Amino acid sequence: MILKELYDFLDSNKEVKGVTTDSRFIKEGYIFLPKHGKNFLGNEFFVEAITKGAIAVVYDEYIPNLVVPLIVVDDLDKELKRLLNLIYQKPFENLKLIGVTGTDGKTSVSTISAYLLNHISKAANIGTNGIFYNNQIYDNLFTTPILCENYRLF
């Protein structure tokens, strides 16, 4: 997908390879959509994201002098959902989820469950030890990955 397909007012044929809300996950060709946090606004991460290869920034206020296109939107959450579904083609549409909660044994139960389910279908396991999917192991920065990473992986 190219940038001008997502934003027809931009005259850019740059390929969009992903979107993320966390500058630590930016890769070449990504759109950066920082969300406001408890202790930060998100705009303090623009330079890092652009340096790492962000091809555009989506934000809810105008910030002057960016070297990449800035798309100003009213609702960051709504725009994030739109971008995730367009870029990653709705990966969760037919997904079934199983959650494991409790004090002890969550990792064991989820690992064994994913192992057994992989014999009859395609299963993934997200937890403390990483993300296991398609015979690959992905490290995760957080026990519960950010939404963009879930879309990217699945």
PLM regions with names:
Residues 1-82, 86:
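N-terminal leader/targeting and accessory segments in enzymes
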Residues 80-154:
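Phosphate-binding loop of NTP-binding sites
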